[in-house]
Design a protein with these regions (language model features):
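Short, charge-enriched, intrinsically disordered boundary segments that mark the beginning
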Residues: 1-13
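Terminal helix-turn-helix DNA-binding modules in bacterial transcription factors
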Residues: 3, 16-33, 52-88, 115-130
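Core residues of bacterial helix-turn-helix
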Residues: 39, 88-89
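Short coil turns linking two alpha-helices in DNA-binding domains
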Residues: 42-43, 91-92
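Short hydrophobic/aromatic patch on the recognition helix
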Residues: 46, 50, 95-96, 100
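Short amphipathic recognition helices of helix-turn-helix/homeodomain-type DNA-binding modules
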Residues: 98, 112-116
Length: 130
């Protein structure tokens, strides 16, 4: 997709606002219509621009942010896994465990108990603002 420089900067600012909103509301249901509204884009344009700038669909981004946040909480706090699941937006702790294992190949408890285990982020397109 080819975007003019001024438009690209404006879009980048809108995406930054969305990323901040998502990170501040991980423990809540994140409504995609609300995100489109916050961005000022139509729902269709919002999905397209978000994926173009961040290299992944918005739903995938939200799940990844939830799992990465859970990993940090597991590593650096003593908060129980059940409570972490709720903090990052899962109604059922087993849902976090399932997604965590899909992303990292290890359960949240195994990750917490093995301090030598390092999670490597999957290869993905770097955000434009970096």
């Amino acid at each position: 997709m080819r975007i003019k420089t001024t438009t690209k900067t404006e879009y980048q600012q809108r995406i930054n606002v969305l990323v901040e909103y998502i990170n501040n509301h991980l423990g809540e249901d994140i409504d995609l219509n609300k995100l489109a509204e916050i961005s000022g884009f139509s729902r269709w344009h919002f999905h397209r621009i978000f994926a173009e700038f961040l290299g992944e669909p918005v739903g995938t981004f939200i799940v990844r942010m939830r799992v990465e946040t859970a990993a940090r909480l597991l590593r650096y706090t003593e908060i129980p896994v059940k409570e972490i699941a709720y903090k990052v937006g899962y109604d059922v702790p087993s849902s976090l465990s399932k997604v965590f294992r899909q992303f990292y190949g290890i359960s949240p408890n195994e990750y917490r108990n093995n301090k030598d285990y390092v999670i490597m982020e999957p290869n993905r397109k770097c955000p434009i603002w970096n």
